[in-house]
Structures are given as structure tokens and as C-alpha cells.
């Protein structure tokens, strides 16, 4: 992943959701980016809107990269990045105007559990951007742990939220992005196999797992970004 900056959610999609719903009114907004990765979303939001960003990730190398990008975009004074386990750290975080859950998977549980856990960290009028996906009607059996569209909406409602806007990811974009990512991964795997021939089987196993994941995303899942607010 060292070749990739945008390794999760699309900053452009998230910025459109913010603009479309008037969340960019006022530069004093406090934003919490959980699982911020290398800071692609955080840095862009700080640069475009002047938001105050708190990004958290468990990978030290990712946080170092995020700080580097913040310096490059001249928004270091607006961005604070932290190495921490979000499952633990979340308990002490309060009063954020916007929380971003950008493709973090089930680190905090399913969608309902995740939203329940972040709710206490929101301000009274705070919103959540959730970048996830749901299972399409047809798919292999190992996808049945993923919710379908209706089940996602049920989980959102049970957690005490409602949808302000839903952005469906375009399959051609997903395919293009996956091809780009797989190209980088393939290149690095070959380099690592040369450097560490005794671990060749581990790198090949990782590559195969990534290919399977890529196939699932392209053919059996619908990637979605939701803007959510508390239910009345």
C-alpha cells in the first residue's frame, strides 16, 4: 500500500455530500476521521473547507504519511493525526460535528453496532459519513455475512440514524480503481518475493486473497457512501 494515498473512501464523493447538504457552512467544524489511513480524506477536507481534523489510525506508517501530506498541502495547523486503536480511543472522544467512517469494515462491529458506538462522540447536530457496501442479490455463499440494501437501512434505523443522502459507487470506477490497486500490489509482491524468497508462499497467499476481494467488490457488492444524521 506504499504506492497508494487514497486507499479507502473517495475524497471527492465525501466533499460532494458535504457541499450538497450545507455542512461546509462554518470553518470551525470539528471532524473525526476514524481509520484515517494516509489522510487523503482528512487533508482534502482541511484544504477545501478549513475544517479542524482529528485523524486516528492504528498503523504508524500511515499516520506518518498523513502528516507528510498535511505538510505538503499546508494544512498541518488544521490536522492532528494520532496512532491509536479506535476501538479503545473512541470512548474518550466527544462533540465532533462530523465523523467519517471510511471503509473501516467491521472493526467496531456491524453497521448498527458501529453507529451506536460513534453516536456518543457526536455533537447534538452532528452527522456521520459512512462508506460501506451491501450485498447484491446474486453472489457466492461466503457473501451471506454481508447485509443487503434493506438490511443496511434497518441497521441504520435501529442505531438511531436516518439517511440524508446516498451515493452509489459506479462499477466502472470500482473496476478501474481495483485494477490500479492490484497493479501496485502485484508489483510489490514480486519485489518482496525477490527480497525474501523464504516467505514467497505468504506473499502469494496475500495476493490471491486480494484478487478474491477485488472480484467480490467488482461483481457482487454495491459500494455506497451515506450521509447520516440522528433520527428525530
Show where each model-derived region lies.
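A short glycine-rich, Lys/Arg-flanked "PGG" loop and its adjoining helix->strand segment in the class I
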Residues: 112-127
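Conserved alpha-helix/loop element of class I SAM-dependent methyltransferases that forms part
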Residues: 8-27
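Conserved Class I S-adenosyl-L-methionine
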Residues: 169-232
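Short alpha-helix
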Residues: 145-160, 165
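A short acidic, Gly/Pro-enriched loop at the edge of an enzyme's catalytic core
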Residues: 90-99
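A short SAM/SAH-binding and catalytic strip from SAM-dependent methyltransferases
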Residues: 98-111
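Conserved class I S-adenosyl-L-methionine
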Residues: 129-151
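Class I SAM-dependent methyltransferase SAM/SAH-binding core
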Residues: 32, 40-88
Amino acid at each position: 500500500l506504499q504506492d497508494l494515498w487514497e486507499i479507502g473512501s473517495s475524497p471527492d464523493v465525501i466533499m460532494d455530500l458535504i457541499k450538497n447538504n450545507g455542512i461546509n457552512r462554518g470553518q470551525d467544524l470539528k471532524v473525526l476521521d476514524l481509520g484515517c489511513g494516509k489522510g487523503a480524506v482528512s487533508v482534502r477536507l482541511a484544504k477545501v473547507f478549513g475544517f479542524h481534523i482529528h485523524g486516528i489510525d492504528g498503523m504508524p506508517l500511515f499516520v506518518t504519511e498523513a502528516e507528510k501530506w498535511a505538510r505538503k498541502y499546508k494544512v498541518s495547523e488544521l490536522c492532528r493525526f494520532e496512532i491509536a486503536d479506535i476501538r479503545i480511543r473512541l470512548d474518550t472522544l466527544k462533540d465532533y460535528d462530523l465523523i467519517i467512517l471510511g471503509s473501516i469494515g467491521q472493526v467496531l462491529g456491524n453497521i448498527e453496532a458501529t453507529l451506536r458506538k460513534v453516536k456518543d462522540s457526536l455533537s447534538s447536530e452532528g452527522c456521520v459519513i459512512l462508506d460501506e457496501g451491501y450485498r447484491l442479490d446474486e453472489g457466492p455463499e461466503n457473501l451471506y455475512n454481508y447485509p443487503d440494501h434493506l438490511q443496511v437501512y434497518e441497521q441504520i434505523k435501529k442505531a438511531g440514524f436516518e439517511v440524508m443522502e446516498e451515493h452509489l459507487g459506479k462499477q466502472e470506477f470500482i473496476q478501474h480503481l481495483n485494477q490500479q490497486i492490484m497493479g501496485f500490489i502485484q508489483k510489490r509482491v514480486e519485489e518482496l518475493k525477490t527480497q525474501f524468497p523464504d516467505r514467497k508462499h505468504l506473499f502469494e497467499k496475500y495476493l490471491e486473497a486480494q484478487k478474491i476481494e477485488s472480484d467480490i467488490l467488482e461483481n457482487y457488492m454495491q459500494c455506497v457512501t451515506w450521509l447520516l444524521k440522528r433520527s428525530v
